[in-house]
């Protein structure tokens, strides 16, 4: 009788350890994103005078890749919302969408590029102007399928400065 109890409880435990269906194992599949939202910055309507120490904070929501993907984010600027030429602000990508800090120096360099300024003599000081900002996101593994551009936000009063890095000189002594 004791052996029957062991056999019965073993079969009962085996019955509870099985299920009717196999667990579904799904690997995340990269979808082509359709929405990517850049939030309006807090300093949108304020006067921003760019210096090398200035930072402009942006936040955005992640593109809908179908899963939480680690994407690279690049900030782009232009002088009009429907511009055909956008200049990327950062060389190294951002990774944290909750805390994108645009450097004042990088933003001023992008503004100089948009104005076509290449030398210090060609720079003329101008009043604060509207600068349009958007983000570009992509995943390194599949940039063609994952690339998406966020909506455009405007920083209404941005005053730039001459921030282009000019080539230096090397002085040699001798013949």
Say what each PLM segment does.
Residues 9-10:
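Sec-dependent N-terminal signal peptides
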Residues 15-19:
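C-terminal motif of bacterial Sec signal peptides marking the signal peptidase cleavage site
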Residues 21-76, 83-85, 92-175:
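Insoluble glucan recognition modules
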Residues 1-5:
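Positively charged n-region of N-terminal signal peptides that target proteins for export
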């Amino acid at each position: 009788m004791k052996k029957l109890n062991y056999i019965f409880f073993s079969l009962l435990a085996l019955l509870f350890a099985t299920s009717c269906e196999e667990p579904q194992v799904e690997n995340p599949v990269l979808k082509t994103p359709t929405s990517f939202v850049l939030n309006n910055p807090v300093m949108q309507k304020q006067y921003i005078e760019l210096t090398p120490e200035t930072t402009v904070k942006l936040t955005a929501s992640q593109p809908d890749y179908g899963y939480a993907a680690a994407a690279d984010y690049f900030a782009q600027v232009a002088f009009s919302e429907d511009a055909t030429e956008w200049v990327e602000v950062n060389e190294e990508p951002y990774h944290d969408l909750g805390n994108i800090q645009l450097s004042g120096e990088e933003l001023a360099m992008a503004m100089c590029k948009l104005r076509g300024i290449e030398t210090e003599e060609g720079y003329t000081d101008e009043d604060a102007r509207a600068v349009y900002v958007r983000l570009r996101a992509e995943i390194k593994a599949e940039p063609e399928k994952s690339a998406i551009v966020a909506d455009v936000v405007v920083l209404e009063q941005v005053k730039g400065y001459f921030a282009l890095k000019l080539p230096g000189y090397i002085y040699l002594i001798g013949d």
